[in-house]
UniProtKB/Swiss-Prot annotation:
InterPro entries: Adenine_deam, Adenine_deam_C, Amidohydro-rel, Metal-dep_hydrolase_composite, Metal_Hydrolase. The keyword Lipid biosynthesis does not apply. One of its GO terms (biological process) is adenine catabolic process. PANTHER family: ADENINE DEAMINASE, N-ACETYLGLUCOSAMINE-6-PHOSPHATE DEACETYLASE. This is Adenine deaminase. It catalyses: adenine + H2O + H(+) = hypoxanthine + NH4(+). The keyword Hydrolase applies. GO terms for molecular function: adenine deaminase activity.
């Protein structure tokens, strides 16, 4: 199936005018509901919405003049009629699903518009992979806009990727029909220091009249932040506290507050609106990263809106942050984000504005979900063989590949350790004294919960393995977890307490072509196969979610108590978020953007 383009307002304006005037019948009327008007922040009972050609023709107390013998009537029975929800920043690949299966998972939760940055697949398959994601996105019955990835690699010189994105790639992508802008500009030091490549990508986007996505993962809100904003990024989702949110909107950016599977950054920032009283127009809700189990079991943007309301936000303001604010940011407020004439007929019916049960979802004028069940097909792209079989280790790994040699004669060593922080993307730079046995540094039964982490190169079959230490997972016994989802270079991350288990896990992923696996005492406890680029599955969302849930349970069985620890695991190689990360080139201190030694001399 080929990508399709939705007819423009101008294309169908004659029909909309005729329906609104009562000269022609509507295709559908939603009758007698409470109209949530996000333009005026009002709840207006006793209204009806008339729809034609997939767009809204009329909204008013009585739409009977728009009705004809073939008009479909949907009785709202006083329920709230709210705009379809928009996710302002997200990565489809984090759901472990292709765009089609991701859409099928989130449509029943009321998401009808997504702004997605496929920079995960860009690191593995380059521009060709981005085009595949873009094309499948355009095939869906809801609105999926693609942001062209900006940073592959995310930090040049500190990691290697399967492919690199160039300014020429960005300029080419700006001509594609579904490209809405530039994906998050993660190389914030590059922008601050006026790196010609980064500024060229931003310039190509701005000259195309499109939006530049931001990513400023630094606590420094002084001149470095000012320089970043001056470079052109228009939004940022990396804030973690109220001061971050306020600084961004004061400088003319949109503050995107995220609630993903493991990122809980709404509660700490939304006080800028609920307590400080800042104008909410420049605040947007998003998910960033949600894995499939969260999507299927907990929800998507409806979950984020509910959470914002639970944090004290007025329900109508929370809805604005997930509809009109998002659409306006991307220059689409005349196209979507509200239930007003001319806009795409993306409408949700719900009986409660706080708990937000999603009872009926209409997208582009057709019923796409009802009572939690998808009601339309989400067409699949024919993924080529080049998108599969992307795990190339060079040789089968053994326990020896994961050994860390101690300095000659040492009985103990001091190590730099990556410290995981629950529910947040940043890590802590920790230090730990570790024992040495037979010349090798050991972590077994360490009182500070230190275990081993390895970054296994998988794009060029170099056989390279970078070893380091991580703390915070709470793993116990002889176990290992391996994943080819390893933001953003997407090599393979292996975390474990035992080198033999680490080798078993890594080799298993090479065997199945990518995914996530957990091993204990020589047995595989869970496996999520992700054959497309080692990032996604084209299996049904419910099947992938069940395997993802089994993965979460297996991590808990191995002693992990972190909320959605898989997401923490997948970000340990993201060398643009402080403080410590691992890459195929070594241990990276993101505060200084330098490689540092794993081991230090004992005082």
């Amino acid at each position: 199936m080929e990508p399709t383009t939705f007819p423009s307002w101008a294309d169908v304006a004659p029909r909309l005018v005729a329906v609104a005037a009562g000269r022609e019948p509507a295709d559908m009327i939603i009758r007698n509901g409470t109209w949530i008007n996000v333009h005026t922040r009002e709840a207006l009972p006793g209204h009806s919405i008339a729809i034609a050609e997939g767009r809204i023709a009329f909204v008013g107390p009585d739409a009977s003049h728009c009705s004809g013998p073939d008009t479909r009537i949907i009785e709202a029975n006083g329920r709230y009629m709210i705009p379809g929800l928009c996710d302002g920043h997200m990565h489809i690949e984090s759901g472990m699903l292709t765009p089609a299966e991701f859409a099928a998972a989130v449509i029943p939760h009321g998401t009808t518009t997504m702004f997605t940055d496929p920079h995960e697949i860009a690191n593995v398959l380059g521009l060709a992979g981005v085009r595949m994601m873009h094309d499948e996105a355009l095939m869906q019955p809801v609105n999926i806009f693609t942001q062209m990835p900006s940073c592959a690699p995310s930090a040049p010189g500190l990691e290697t990727t399967g492919y690199e994105i160039t300014p020429e790639d960005v300029a080419e992508a700006m001509t594609w029909p579904g490209i809405i802008g530039l994906g998050e500009m993660m190389n914030f030091p590059g922008v601050t220091n006026a790196d010609p490549k980064m500024l060229a990508e931003i310039a190509a986007t701005q000259r195309a009249g499109k939006t530049v996505g931001g990513h400023y993962a630094s606590p420094d809100l002084g001149p470095a932040f000012a320089a970043y904003v001056a470079g052109g990024p228009a939004d940022d989702h990396e804030g973690t506290c109220e001061a971050d949110a306020i600084a961004r909107v004061r400088q003319g950016m949109r503050s995107m507050m995220r609630l993903g599977s493991a990122w809980y950054d709404v509660e700490t920032q939304i006080t800028a609106v609920t307590e400080k009283g800042l104008d909410p127009r420049n605040f947007i809700l998003c998910t960033d990263d949600c894995h499939s189990a969260t999507l299927v079991n907990d929800g998507h943007m409806n979950r984020v809106v509910r959470h914002a309301i639970a944090c004290g936000c007025d329900p109508l303001i929370a809805l604005q942050m997930a509809t009109i604010n998002t659409a306006t940011h991307f220059g689409l407020e005349r196209e979507l984000g509200s239930t007003a004439p001319g806009r795409r007929a993306d409408v949700i019916l719900t009986s409660d504005l706080r708990d937000l049960p999603i009872e009926l979802v209409i997208a582009r004028g057709q019923v796409v979900a009802e009572n939690g069940k998808i009601a339309v097909d989400c067409p699949h792209y024919d993924w080529p063989d080049t998108a599969r079989g992307t795990v190339h280790l060079g040789h089968a790994l053994s326990a020896r590949d994961f050994e860390i040699a101690a300095p000659t004669g040492a009985n103990r060593v001091r190590a730099n350790v990556i410290g995981v922080v629950e529910n947040q993307a940043p890590t802590k730079a920790l230090k730990a004294e570790l024992p040495v046995r037979e010349g090798l540094v050991e972590t077994a039964e360490h009182p500070d919960d230190v275990c081993q982490i390895a970054l296994v190169e998988r794009h060029r079959a170099t056989g390279g393995v970078t070893n380091a230490f991580v703390s915070g997972f709470g793993y116990q016994g002889r176990m290992a977890m391996a994943s080819t989802v390893a933001h953003d270079s997407h090599h393979m991350i292996v975390v474990g307490t035992d080198r033999e288990q680490m080798a078993l896990a890594a080799n298993r992923l090479a065997e199945v072509g990518g995914g996530i696996t957990i091993w204990r005492d020589g047995q595989e406890l869970a496996l999520v196969e992700l054959p497309i680029a080692g990032l996604m599955s084209d299996s049904p969302a419910a099947e992938v979610a069940a395997k993802a849930q089994a993965m979460v349970e297996a991590m808990a069985a191995c002693g992990c108590t972190l909320n959605n620890a898989y997401m923490q695991h997948s970000l340990l190689a993201l060398v643009v978020i402080p403080e410590l990360r691992i890459s195929d080139l070594g241990l990276i201190d993101v505060r200084s953007f330098e490689r540092i030694d794993l081991l230090e001399p004992l005082a």
